[in-house]
Regions:
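Conserved RecA-like P-loop NTPase helicase motor core
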Residues: 95-101, 107-284
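Conserved helicase/translocase motor-coupling segment
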Residues: 1-99, 162-191
Length: 284
């Protein structure tokens, strides 16, 4: 099933890539031969696309790992281990973006909390749909945005249709929530200590409904204490939440269970990932 989901998202990105090239021609950024008339506009659109793609697939892979990690944690806890999960991203910016866009009366659902929104934001904000016109500057023909009599940017209907096609394909795909949220929902916040930098988080009530909980400035300290005191058997931390803290079975800690450390998301910095591993591997 996961292979099918991944292939579907890969297909959606292939559509975006193809439509992006077509839109660059439709708007006049590229000419019919593929030569660029507006190198800055093309570079901006393509760099935003590549960074969005990289960010999205990182989140997608993390989310798809979650089910396997959850099963492993269940086994570890049953065997008497205390589990520590290391991540980098928390998805807070995505959550805040979604909440800002929602109507106050709308119900929060899992499908709304997916990194798919990163790509939709790119398509809405950075996909090239504005027509360009050729002008001569210092003997060189370059493209600049075309405006109507009122000074409003002119939209290329062809490029707009290409964007909408890509958005429709993307929105039809199955949502994959973040790994952090999936772990919290699977075990419950009464079992999982969260030590991250986010100020709000989505939790599930006993009936499965999602709600938003605010986290205070002291949340990380109290969550760390709960884990080290043995009140919670699972701890998940991010770069921001892990700074200056230790999660090993220290002689002064009540929680003397052996640790199982899951490097779920190593991130882009090897030194930070290794430093995180050290938080469960201390000598005293």
């Amino acid at each position: 099933a996961q292979i099918g989901i991944y292939d579907a998202y890969a297909g959606a990105f292939r559509t975006i890539h193809h439509n992006l090239e077509a839109a660059l021609t439709a708007t006049g950024v590229n000419d019919a031969s593929g030569q660029t008339n507006a190198s800055a506009a093309k570079a901006s659109a393509k760099s935003r696309f590549e960074s969005t793609k990289q960010r999205f697939f990182n989140h997608l892979l993390m989310g798809m790992k979650a089910s396997t990690v959850i099963r492993a944690i269940e086994d570890d806890v049953a065997e008497g281990f205390a589990c520590v999960i290391q991540v980098v991203s928390t998805g807070e910016s995505l959550l805040k973006h979604r909440l800002e866009a929602m109507d106050p009366e709308d119900e929060l659902v899992e499908g709304a909390l997916t990194p798919r929104d990163y790509v939709l934001s790119y398509l809405e904000q950075a996909f090239p749909i504005h027509a360009q016109k050729l002008v001569e500057i210092d003997g060189n023909m370059v493209a600049e945005p075309l405006r109507d009599a009122n000074g409003t940017l002119v939209v290329s209907r062809e490029a707009e249709a290409l964007r909408d096609e890509a958005m429709m394909e993307l929105m039809s795909l199955a949502p994959i929530p973040s790994a952090l949220d999936q772990i919290l929902w699977a075990f419950g916040d009464e079992v999982v200590a969260e030590v991250t930098g986010r100020s709000i988080r989505p939790l599930k009530s006993s009936d499965g409904a999602l709600f938003i909980e605010k986290r205070s400035a002291s949340s990380n300290s109290s969550e760390t204490r709960a884990f080290m005191e043995g009140e919670k058997d699972i701890l998940i931390f991010s770069d921001a939440g892990g700074t200056g803290r230790s999660y090993h079975a220290a002689q002064t800690a009540k929680n003397q269970k052996r640790r199982r450390h899951y490097l779920l998301e190593p991130g882009w910095r090897a030194d930070a990932a290794i430093q995180g591993l050290g938080r469960t591997h201390r000598s005293a």
